Every structure is written in structure tokens, then in C-alpha cells.
């Protein structure tokens, strides 16, 4: 509380995309509904991209936008999708799905605040060349040194709250400097 922050270790614990779609079909809420999709611990690394595509296919008709979350620090090796080879494959396959299914809702990539400028630039360049709409910046950070209380510096999980503000704003400013066209 002193740091106005939370460290979470939740990951993507849920009942799955089919359960989500069932709930979305029954929703009475009339506001904007965004669906955050991400690989969970049951997703095998070699199938993660296909898992994202399955989720997109199932939810796009029932949501106003989709967030492709590749930046949760609580799912083992998920941030590996930030490397160029994996990122290229993910964006290329999502782009194919968007065109094949004629998806008209925006799809965004949610990025980590811990990535290098080079990685962020690479991602932004790929997004600009695709049918994706933009990025959501940022997820939680693994950098606990942002906390005043040193006893929490070694805790596992994603840090959110006030200590992350400057780091997230730096990422947002950097992304904005790369392209005035990307939301």
C-alpha cells in the first residue's frame, strides 16, 4: 500500500474460450466489450499461436475489440512472443485470419513495459504493415526495483500501480514517436 501498487501472480486462470463465448452470447451489457486473449499454462509453446487464432475465431463476433496479450509475466515463456521470429509468425497469421474472416473489429497487441526500444520498434513496424489496429501499452512489469520497499524486490509476478507509471509513459511516448498513425 505504501507504494500504491499490487504484485499479482494470477496468470490467465479461467474456464476457457468456449465458456467465455457462452457468457458473451448471453450478455445484457450494451457498452463496449473488449476480449483479452492470452496463452495459459495449458497452451504448449509450439501451439500458442494457433491457440490465439482459435480464440480470435471464436470471440470476434461477440466483442467490440480484441487484445492479443503476449506480455503477461505470469505465463511461463509467454514474453518469448516478443522475439522477432515468433512475433512475425503471430502477426502474419493474425493478419491472414483478419482478411479470411473479414474481421472488422480492431485487434491490438498488448506489450510489455520491459521490452527494449529495438523490440518495440520491430513490433510497431510489423503492426503498421498488417491489418492490426495498434498496441495496448502496457502490461505489468517484472521490475520490482521500482518499489520503495526492498523486501518486495525479489517477489515473483507482475507489478502494477503508481511505480509503473513512468515506465509505461516512456513506452507510450516512444511508440508515439515511431508512428503518429498507430493508436
What are these regions (language model features)?
Residues 30-36, 100-112, 178-183:
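Short beta-strand/loop segments at the ligand-binding rim of alpha/beta enzyme cores
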Residues 20, 35, 68-69, 110, ...:
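Conserved, mostly hydrophobic/aromatic
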Residues 9-19, 44-57:
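Glycine-rich anion/phosphate-binding loops
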Residues 38-42, 71-73, 110-114, 138-142:
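Active-site beta-loop-alpha junctions enriched in small/polar residues
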Residues 73-86, 126-182:
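Glycine/Thr-rich beta-alpha phosphate-binding loop at enzyme active sites
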Residues 1-31:
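A gly/proline- and charged-residue-enriched helix-loop-helix capping module
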Residues 40-53, 80, 86, 108-128:
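Active-site glycine- and acidic-residue-rich loops that bind
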Residues 48-100, 112:
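Metal-dependent enolase-superfamily TIM-barrel catalytic cores that perform enediolate-based chemistry
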Amino acid at each position: 500500500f505504501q507504494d500504491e501498487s499490487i504484485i499479482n501472480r494470477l496468470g490467465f486462470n479461467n474456464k476457457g474460450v468456449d465458456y467465455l463465448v457462452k457468457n458473451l452470447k448471453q450478455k445484457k451489457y450494451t457498452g463496449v466489450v473488449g476480449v483479452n486473449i492470452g496463452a495459459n499454462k495449458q497452451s504448449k509453446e509450439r501451439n500458442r499461436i494457433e491457440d490465439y487464432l482459435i480464440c480470435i475465431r471464436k470471440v470476434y463476433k461477440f466483442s467490440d475489440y480484441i487484445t492479443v496479450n503476449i506480455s503477461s509475466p505470469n505465463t511461463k515463456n509467454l514474453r518469448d512472443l516478443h522475439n522477432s521470429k515468433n512475433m512475425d509468425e503471430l502477426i502474419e497469421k493474425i493478419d491472414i485470419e483478419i482478411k479470411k474472416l473479414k474481421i472488422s473489429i480492431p485487434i491490438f497487441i498488448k506489450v510489455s513495459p520491459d521490452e527494449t526500444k529495438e523490440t518495440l520498434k520491430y513490433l510497431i513496424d510489423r503492426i503498421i504493415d498488417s491489418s492490426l489496429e495498434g498496441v495496448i501499452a502496457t502490461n505489468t512489469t517484472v521490475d520490482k526495483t521500482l518499489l520503495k520497499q526492498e523486501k518486495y524486490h525479489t517477489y515473483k509476478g507482475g507489478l502494477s500501480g503508481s511505480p509503473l507509471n513512468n515506465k509505461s509513459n516512456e513506452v507510450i511516448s516512444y511508440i508515439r514517436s515511431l508512428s503518429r498513425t498507430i493508436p
